[in-house]
Swiss-Prot record:
Lineage: Eukaryota, Viridiplantae, Streptophyta, Embryophyta, Tracheophyta
Subcellular location: Mitochondrion
Protein keywords: Isomerase, Magnesium, Metal-binding, Mitochondrion, Transit peptide
Protein name (Swiss-Prot/TrEMBL): Oxaloacetate tautomerase FAHD1, mitochondrial
Encoding gene per record: FAHD1
Cofactor: Mg(2+); Mn(2+)
Length: 230
């Protein structure tokens, strides 16, 4: 039974059509970047081409040439089990198929420029390898997703440690709100926000991150090697 649930959970990501990010969903993180605390979820989209699956040989987070400040953001990812549209908050958890540990890699100087100009966050959030993600943890294996410890280290230095209990908007609220705006499909991923402690990584460094007691991942960071010459 457990093996079947695990196999079904892994298949969800293959069906994913989009990644929905939630910004500033932890008060301390909003404040550390000098941002106001939102009164409703702040959403942005990432393409599934930004996924970087943990455990794949040779997989590494790539720092594109123009990026000078690539930041790590550790997050709980929620993976949808079925199509969801206009879902009431009371039944929102029925649409969850599993969870994962994810990183929302962010080109911070691109984000700062976009915010100043009132532009979308595509350049800073959507590039290849900018959504490293673990295997999917079946919903049945997570007793309380609103009380999970997230952590992240860079070269064994602890950078981030926080609890999903500190999220401003909890999972049922996020699913209900997002599904009132856009239809969520089976396998779609919601990145629920990051606790404080975000910071830069450089080529040659190693990121380790996890959900305590459930999963941990490890990714090398390298400079992107383009497949064409100019």
């Amino acid at each position: 039974m457990a093996a079947a649930a695990a196999a079904a959970a892994q298949r969800l990501l293959a069906a994913s059509t989009k990644i929905i990010g939630v910004g500033r969903n932890y008060v301390a993180h909003a404040k550390e970047l000098g941002n106001p605390v939102p009164k409703e979820p702040l959403l942005f989209l990432k393409p599934t081409s930004s996924f970087l699956h943990a455990g794949v040989a040779g997989a590494a987070i790539e720092v594109p040439g123009p990026v000078e400040s690539l930041h790590h953001e550790v997050e709980l990812a929620v993976v949808l089990s079925q199509r969801a549209r206009d879902v009431p908050e009371a039944s929102a958890m029925d649409f969850v198929g599993g969870y994962a540990l994810a990183l929302d890699m962010t080109a911070r100087e691109f984000q700062s420029a976009a915010k100043s100009a009132g532009l979308p966050w595509t350049l800073c959030k959507a590039q290849d390898t900018f959504t490293p993600i673990s295997a999917v943890i079946p919903k049945s294996a997570v007793a309380n997703p609103n009380d999970l410890e997230l952590w992240l280290k860079v070269d064994d230095e602890l950078r981030q440690k926080g609890s999903t209990s500190d999220m401003i908007f909890k999972i049922p609220s996020l699913i209900s709100y997002i599904s009132s705006i856009m239809t969520l499909m089976e396998g779609d991923v919601i990145l629920t926000g990051t606790p404080e402690g975000v910071g830069p990584v450089r080529p040659g460094q190693k990121i380790k991150a996890g959900i305590t007691g459930l999963v941990d991942v490890e990714f090398d960071v390298q400079k992107r090697k383009r497949s064409f010459s100019t």
